[in-house]
Amino acid sequence: YWSGYNQIMASNLMDSGLSPDEIINYLIENDVNNNPTIRQYGVVDIYEGGRSAAYTGGNCMDYKNHILGTNYAIQGNILLNEQILINIENNFNNTIGTLSDKLMAALQGANIPGADSRCLDNGTSSLSAFIRVAEPFDEPDNFLLDLNINNTNNNQEPINLLQNLYNEWLNEQDPLGDI
């Protein structure tokens, strides 16, 4: 369960110079609802060698886990199986480009019917999808990139819809595209 308070705390702790491991430990010990077992956290510090840390609470719904690597922390719960996380990791690592390019490719790794096991009957990967990238001095309501497909209808694939929005966003950033 997402908590805006916990997210703000994590951001403030990162700004104060704590390591990803220290931030995760703080969040577990100081959960806003005193129930970290229902949470998943991932923290990456791309400015200090790509350090990463994660936590998956025991009361998150199965399949649940996380994968860590340099410059990434991948978390998932209510997943069809472990392969979803592996696909996400492979897409992230095998994509050349900006952080946003790598994140969008990672999301495509979960573009499998039932990746969120609640959506198998719909034939979609999930109910919604979003991508958010912030630069160091972005304001909370004005990120470099903040795209969201929320609760799609008619069995539309949210990751494909998000990919379309992302492609439009890319074209707005560089209207000439690749030359």
Located regions from the model:
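N-terminal nucleophile
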Residues: Y1-I179
